[in-house]
């Protein structure tokens, strides 16, 4: 770690104009991005007496080894460039309001021939439209249960759909009229798409249009003396009313607005966002993040403020609000534009769906950045922040602090939710943080390290009698798993033909991990100047293989095993010149810690927090490895006898299995039977027959 005085810019060299600055570590990785009205004034704060800095800021300046800056023409441009660089470099000391992947959503697979509605958690996919997020999983399922009475669209998986299509009879939902049963042709593709349109239109907020239509249809059915249909439509309206009851009107003027409030303590901040559309609460989201060191001082703890008292204003709130507004709406617009492109591609590919997409509420910049944004406090640099929001929306934005009436009352509700979120987070975190800090401190002492380890990596090998040999690499930072940095490997050199050498496998995985790390360091340019591109312009791999996120070296590298495994990994370290990583082995039987070259292991007390953490990391590596091994083994066992037949592609294999029902039944078929399948001539049918029977 570098002493800040070693890279402090010379006096007078820092400009006084607005700009954006980057701190880099010794591997040239960007670890912090900030903006300033006056670069000299802001950067000078980082190089004062380090004992006066906030602990997080102090950690950052010691982790850095250089600082760079870019002068811009205005504060608005500085705000935009800061956001772009945070997206581009993903600096570890910046606050990032990432979407919580655990929020439940209601999804509609609009890209399928027969779209389906389903409960969903996780990152967004192409060709799927999302509604939510919801605060609870049961809320999604209850909404889906009620609305499928009115809009009986498909909700089953592809496998269930195909099975009932081949059986020629619908599932239970088809019999109780909660699915239109497109699998058996009860409705056409166009008719099912109309049902989907009604569902998505309702979920998009066009509720009045839906209820008016149902009322008109019910009255028409009654006039025609079709009382059975009228009763069914009445039940549909009751189901709609139940859904609407859960979305009570909170603003009588039908406002579209987002309401945003924070609760803070000395180190962390919780933010809550309520999405109001048409005067109703349509969504709610929350995050808890660490405060950046720039403004994480000894400030007000909102969770201890007595109810009803006017809280002191946290000086960090305007800065937090500015960061959140730019990041949250910048990400939302980027996501909306991506989804719009995907929808356009679907329309182009399936012209019959064009009407359906036009009927559905379009996802536009104006729909994700509402006209009105109600905030707890005015953001820092309010005028510049408002300009950025207006550019994102493409129209005017009114961002203000509500002072009275329903909007003020709703803001107080959002504030209470933010306080409760922070309170629950702190209650959960207190025990965890104390134990993690003690564990890292004990590890530092037991392994004679200069500082407590920030990042720990562990690898494990998994196989059954030398088959499907794989390895895992898990990463823990501050004693918590960092799953975005997990890796999995197929062992190549040290295994094959039914044999495996665990010691050689450890050496191979260690070499692949740290060879890549060295290559990454060599590949980083000396400096990266902003070229006008945005984060979305760059190609980023969807899987967690982004080299920039993987290049941070661990302070401790754990191999699962004893002295032989440690010795093998140490040989690789010596070969690659790795000297700044502590290597240890954790033997399963007695939980002994083996160090390179030491004849005796280190024994930690059984009640040691450090031992518990090491066990947790080792067990996580084992879990991740064995999960991957099972996937590989299952994949190998699913290999069909049809795969080895030349000239038989995936689509034709699928057609054969679909026609005959299974490979076993296909084996009973004659050449003539096979030639009756669409796309199979006598020559190919004979090749299939011979291929199947030659394998006996």
Curated annotation (Swiss-Prot):
- Major localization listed first in the record, in broad terms: cytoplasm
Q: Record's SUPFAM superfamilies?
A: C-terminal UvrC-binding domain of UvrB, GIY-YIG endonuclease, RuvA domain 2-like
- Cystine links in this protein are none
Q: Which NCBIfam families match?
A: PRK00558.1-5, uvrC
Q: Which Gene3D superfamilies match?
A: 5' to 3' exonuclease, C-terminal subdomain, GIY-YIG endonuclease, UVR domain, UvrC, RNAse H endonuclease domain
Q: Which InterPro entries match?
A: GIY-YIG_endonuc (IPR000305), GIY-YIG_endonuc_sf (IPR035901), GIY-YIG_UvrC_Cho (IPR047296), Hlx-hairpin-Hlx_DNA-bd_motif (IPR003583), RuvA_2-like (IPR010994), UVR_dom (IPR001943), UVR_dom_sf (IPR036876), UvrABC_protein_C (IPR050066)
Subcellular localization is given as: Cytoplasm
Q: Does the keyword DNA damage apply?
A: yes
Q: Which UniProt keywords apply?
A: Cytoplasm, DNA damage, DNA excision, DNA repair, Excision nuclease, SOS response
Which branch of life, at top level? Bacteria
Task: State its role.
Answer: The UvrABC repair system catalyzes the recognition and processing of DNA lesions. UvrC both incises the 5' and 3' sides of the lesion. The N-terminal half is responsible for the 3' incision and the C-terminal half is responsible for the 5' incision.
Gene Ontology molecular-function annotations: DNA binding; excinuclease ABC activity
Tell me which GO cellular component terms the UniProt record holds: cytoplasm; excinuclease repair complex
The segment(s) forming the GIY-YIG domain are 16-95
**Protein name per Swiss-Prot or TrEMBL:** UvrABC system protein C
Domain UVR, first and last residues per copy = 208-243
- One GO BP annotation of this record: nucleotide-excision repair
One Pfam match, by short name? HHH_5
What is the similarity comment for this entry? Belongs to the UvrC family.
Q: Give the record's subunit note.
A: Interacts with UvrB in an incision complex.
